[in-house]
Amino acid sequence: MQARNAKKEPPGGCLACRYRLGALSHTAAARYDRIAQLLIPGYSSLARLGVALLATSPLGVMPGASILVAGCGTGAELLEARRQRPDWRLTAIDPSPAMLAAARERLTSEQGNAGEGIAWQDTRLEDLDSSTGFDGALAVLVLQGLPDDGSKLRFLTALARSLRPGGEVLLVDLMQGEKSALQDQLAAARLAFQRAAGPLDGEKIANDEPLRGLTEAVHPIGSSRLAALVEAAGFSDPAPVFRALDYEGVLLQRLA
């Protein structure tokens, strides 16, 4: 798949505010992941979970399956895919060339030539040519960075368009709880979980755009709204596969 020639500046942080940077070194990428593990419950298992789910999907189980990592960030999902399924043909997209460079550097540092054979594209998903469909996709902490002003639907529609019929995608995002007696407790517990990680330099996080994307400028939606959006985009009903406080992961399948 190739990016279309007309490349637009991503509005409001593009795929997610987590990915808009000027430069990001391998050291900074590793720091991002360490802090994400402290702030997001279950973060350290998300890449392993996502790859395992796609590896057992009807299309992803096939040798040489084509997998898209939308908003590849610091490369956690790419590393795990190389560990579990070295036969997969991977495409990594991110609107930030600096983030792509950091992910490539990380794969080289941790797995030697693991970055070879990956198609790297600094583009938005919406600008990706959909002439050839992927067998599966991962989009972790991406949708939460898009406002619900049509941006979420455009992203999901482009995601469905990029997949072959029957292809599956894992979404993981901060969600807005439905009205319940326990919802306030879940939100309070998330803050307590983050505080229990120990002192973090709030000033440094506030001035660090990718880290700020973990706690600010997010646009969570409820499960009923997500269900409506994925249906409009051409996906099956969301199947819950992960939940840790108010972070949720769902598996979607593109309908024929």
Model regions and ranges:
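Conserved beta-strand signature within the Rossmann-like core of class I S-adenosyl-L-methionine
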Residues: 166-173
